[in-house]
A protein has these predicted regions:
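N-terminal secretory signal peptides and thylakoid transit peptides that target proteins
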Residues: 12, 16, 21-45
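Zn-dependent metallo-beta-lactamase
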Residues: 32-88
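Conserved beta-strand hairpin/beta-sheet module of binuclear metal-dependent hydrolase folds
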Residues: 65-110, 115, 206-220
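Divalent metal-coordination and catalytic microenvironments
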Residues: 70, 84, 94, 124, ...
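Active-site HxH/HxHxD metal-binding segment of metal-dependent hydrolases
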Residues: 110-184, 203
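Short, charged, surface-exposed loops that flank catalytic or proteolytic processing sites
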Residues: 286-297
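C-terminal regulatory/interaction regions
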Residues: 295-337
Length: 337
């Protein structure tokens, strides 16, 4: 497809960046509350909860989901925290938000009987995954993340699309073990595979797969109850999200439990649903991009219409998807003329 010049988008700059060293980095009339309206409103609330600033007051009760022997998920602490606690020590995948991390760590100690966290994975740089870093770094915890995540945590992020700023972490609270290529860790009789899913939600997202338990921690690459958050401030985009979900599908079988960044543990069928939605919306937006449509014109065209009852309010998702695809037209099959 050939690209016609898009009409100007009246929205403010989205704060797009090219990598961790980029300096910019990072009312309608009331209507009856029918089921569709309720779900759209719920979806908006879920997205908003993912984008709360680091100083937000959150007192959601913590809940626990058992996943097997010495393996459980804590929810309600800003983001899902996966806890594996063999005799060798406690291993966490994500650490909750700064506001709730003390509550999360206290519950971990009470549930496991262990005082020290041996290993912490940061699945990406966002505040609700890295809230425990500043505490755990003082006790010698190994903090593992992709190198891009460490780089983002070392700069002040100005996320213009959210109209929020996120301060850098102190140097000692940043990941102390980083990687680029897929890795495997043996710990407590379990084998954990972890690797990057490029530009799926940010440019540093990783999965952590516990082979024996058959539990796949997907974090915010997988979305429940809302359209995926494409963090354009750190290079997330719709094709990256689709590629990430497809990578997770290849790792899964019918019995795999999928741990998202927020929301309930999912069956593998959820990956199929997210991939199908992303594929359809991406194709529709590519056609509109080739016709030179703006972000608002794409929103008005309702490319997500049949999915909204499940995924919620699509406006921010479409707007961020537009920002991503407009920077990568050739990867969308659109040639510039």
């Amino acid at each position: 497809m050939k690209l016609r010049r898009a009409a100007p988008d009246p929205t403010p700059s989205a704060g797009l960046s090219v990598g961790p060293f980029d300096a910019a980095r990072p009312t309608r009339a009331a209507a009856p509350l029918n089921r569709r309206h309720f779900l759209l409103t719920l979806g908006t609330a879920v997205v908003a909860s993912r984008l709360q600033p680091v100083w937000a007051k959150d007192r959601t009760p913590l809940t626990v989901t058992e996943l097997g022997e010495r393996l459980f998920v804590i929810s309600g602490g800003g983001g899902n925290v996966t806890v594996f606690h063999p005799d060798e020590g406690v291993l966490l995948v994500d650490g909750g938000s700064p506001e709730r991390h003390a509550d999360v760590l206290d519950l971990v100690r009470k549930r496991t009987g262990q005082k020290r966290v041996h290993t912490l994975f940061n699945t990406h740089w966002h505040w609700n995954q890295t809230g425990s870093n500043t505490t755990l770094c003082k006790t010698g915890t190994r903090i593992i993340a992709h190198e891009n995540t460490k780089l983002w945590l070392g700069v002040d992020v100005d996320s213009k699309w959210e109209n929020k700023k996120y301060p850098r972490l102190p140097a000692n609270a940043r990941p102390n073990q980083t990687f680029y290529t897929p890795q495997t860790l043996s710990f407590g009789g379990e084998t954990l595979d972890y690797a990057l899913m490029p530009e799926a939600h940010t440019d540093g997202d990783i999965y952590v797969f516990l082979r024996k338990a058959n539990v796949l921690v997907a974090a915010d690459v997988v979305s429940v109850g809302a359209y995926p958050v494409l963090d354009i401030a750190s290079n997330g985009w719709i094709t990256g999200n689709l590629n990430g979900v497809n990578a997770l599908k290849k790792l899964s079988n019918a019995q795999t439990r999928i741990v998202p960044g927020l929301g309930a543990v999912q069956a593998p069928a959820h990956l199929d649903e997210q991939a199908a939605m992303l594929t359809t919306v991406r194709q529709r937006m590519a056609k509109m991009l080739a016709k030179g449509k703006s972000a608002q014109e794409m929103i008005d065209a309702q490319p997500t219409k049949e999915f909204d009852a499940v995924w919620g309010n699509p406006e921010q998702f479409i707007r961020n998807a537009f920002r991503g695809i407009s920077l990568r037209p050739q990867q969308m099959g659109v040639s510039i003329v």
